Amino acid sequence: MKNFFFCSIRFLVMASIICLSTTTKAEYPDKPIRLIIPFFPGGTTDQIARTVGTHLSRAWGQPVVMENKPGANGVIASETLVSSRSDGYTLMLVAMGHAINPLIYQKLPYDTDRDFTPITLLAKFNQLILVNPNLPASNVKELIALSKIRPLTYGSGGNGSSQHLAGALFFSMAGIQGIHVPYKGGSQAMLDTISGNIDMMVAQPSSPTYVSSGQLKAIAIATKHRSPDYPNTPTIIESGVPKFESYSWYGLVGPKNLSPQVLNKINAETLVVLNSENFKNLVSSLGGETAGNTPAEFSKFIKDERRRYSVAFKNTEINLNQ
């Protein structure tokens, strides 16, 4: 009888501990969150990541620690994310390279569709043909004519970056030769375009003042229709290169197998960020538009982007390893 009594007491104590631990389980997030940025500090990507991170930190009362891991068009950063726990405490900002890396690299150390959890598309940005102001070309026709006299150099943030893709696609569709000059970041390529070390880029200006101040010359925009931000800048299509359209974008992902509760919470709070005046003003000042969608919609968007560029590459002569 005595043993039965003590066994009963032990059972009740253990049951109480289990119930207490269940009811007092901390709600996500209860510790700092790590936000990986696959590019060097500075530039559009960094500004977007830090704006999102600052808002999430204030909303959740937990630090969001930024960690820049540049290299290999986002592959190095992606490896870090893939090896992290699927608990929502490690997230990553992604750009176009995330979608098209499977087209560039024969073997990746991860599966883009299976090893990540898409959270939401953050923003999309118009791209322009930006040239050094001393380049003797004020429109696409003059640029094409100049390229037939000498090959033009175009810069990018690295092989497979949005600037590389847009530049390679433009030269191929325009039927002219260009020399790709990859940099460790898009902002470095932009500064070298300003200084005249390279001729041009196809990119969104990391600072609109570069164009308004005359440090860069915008001769065409890579959208279907003219942009209200650059009303006097013709599209590349109307300038004589049919069907040319290009843009850059940024999104947020986590490792695979995020729980629905954590995923939905991150998505919901990130959408609050995107609807804030602070974020809208930042994106607008950089020549872009805020986005925001569901995890399922962003997953489809990533696959559609890869399919879009896959078709474009098959129809043009592009070597992305150059």
At which residue positions do the language-model features occur?
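N-terminal signal peptide c-region/cleavage motif recognized by signal peptidases
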Residues: 21-23
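N-terminal (or domain-start) structured segment
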Residues: 26-114, 151-153, 159, 175-202, ...
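Extracytoplasmic/secreted proteins, especially bacterial periplasmic and envelope-associated proteins
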Residues: 47, 51, 55, 76, ...
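Hinge/capping helix and adjacent helix->loop/strand transition within the periplasmic-binding protein
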Residues: 83-89, 103-188, 236, 249-282
